[in-house]
UniProtKB/Swiss-Prot annotation:
Segments passing through the bilayer: none
Source species, domain of life: Archaea
Signal peptide as annotated in the record: none
Region of interest: Disordered: 1-64, 184-224
Organism annotation: Methanocella arvoryzae (strain DSM 22066 / NBRC 105507 / MRE50)
Gene3D superfamilies assigned to the protein according to its UniProt record, in alphabetical order: 1.10.8.50, 30s ribosomal protein s13, domain 2 (4.10.910.10)
Compositional bias per record (Basic and acidic residues), positions renumbered to this chain: 1-17, 210-224
Quaternary structure (record): Part of the 30S ribosomal subunit. Forms a loose heterodimer with protein S19. Forms two bridges to the 50S subunit in the 70S ribosome.
InterPro entries: Rbsml_uS13_C, Ribosomal_uS13, Ribosomal_uS13-like_H2TH, Ribosomal_uS13_archaeal, Ribosomal_uS13_CS
Protein name as catalogued: Small ribosomal subunit protein uS13
One GO cellular component term: small ribosomal subunit
């Protein structure tokens, strides 16, 4: 009987110990029904939201500043549209077409499909350098002024130089009294177009009725 009593006493002691440990673990949970928040490490900056007791929001990610677009880019004394692509913006220069603009972009190592207004100044300077020396960067058969009258050189004119050269050529044709020069003097079409209905110059002649017709119309009105 003594052995049985010893065993029962040991079981009771173990049961009491387990109850004590369980009560000790459940003690912090009973206070307020929430676990206590862990204390921040010493020296760490405390969050304002944590001080107030609310949930803090994540700080917004810093937005990268976007490059400002230049709406007007000046190249070769011409204001170009900065919202267009490079290959189309360069065609705004008189004397430069689509094909030459693509060649200029390739020679300057600039993306022809990039927006002109977003190009850095270094790439814009490269475009200017290629345009200033087009004779070396463009095939001879693409130049717009081959075998110049005065110098005999192959050139590519653009901008104001092109307009002045065209005016000088017309003045030369007028001085030598060529057919084209005479047509330019008279303000008529130069390239053989018909002028029966279009291209007429001078004052328009109105329709004039004859005196007899006017008198007959007046008599008819009197009879009525």
């Amino acid at each position: 009987m003594s052995e049985k009593t010893d065993k029962t006493e040991k079981k009771q002691k173990k049961a009491e110990e387990t109850v004590e440990t369980a009560s000790a673990e459940a003690a912090p949970a009973k206070k307020g029904g929430k676990k206590q928040a862990a204390k921040p490490a010493e020296g760490a900056p405390a969050d304002e939201a944590a001080r107030k007791g609310g949930k803090g929001k994540k700080p917004a990610a810093e937005e990268k500043p976007k490059d400002e677009i230049k709406y007007i880019v000046r190249i070769a004394n011409t204001d170009l549209d900065g919202t267009q692509t490079v290959e189309f913006a360069l065609t705004g220069i008189k004397g430069i077409g689509n094909r030459i603009s693509k060649i200029i972009a390739r020679q300057a190592q600039v993306d022809p499909h990039a927006t002109m207004g977003y190009l850095p100044p270094e790439q814009v300077d490269k475009l200017r350098a290629v345009i200033d020396n087009l004779e070396a960067n463009v095939p001879v058969w693409m130049l717009n002024r081959r075998r110049d009258i005065y110098t005999g050189e192959d050139k590519h004119l653009y901008g104001v130089d092109l307009t002045m050269a065209v005016k000088e050529d017309i003045n030369i044709m007028k001085k030598i009294r060529s057919y084209k020069g005479i047509r330019h003097e008279r303000g008529q079409k130069v390239r053989g177009q018909r002028t029966k209905s279009t291209g007429r110059t001078g004052a328009t002649v109105g329709v004039v009725r004859k005196k007899g017709e006017q008198g007959g119309a007046a008599k008819k009105e009197d009879k009525k």
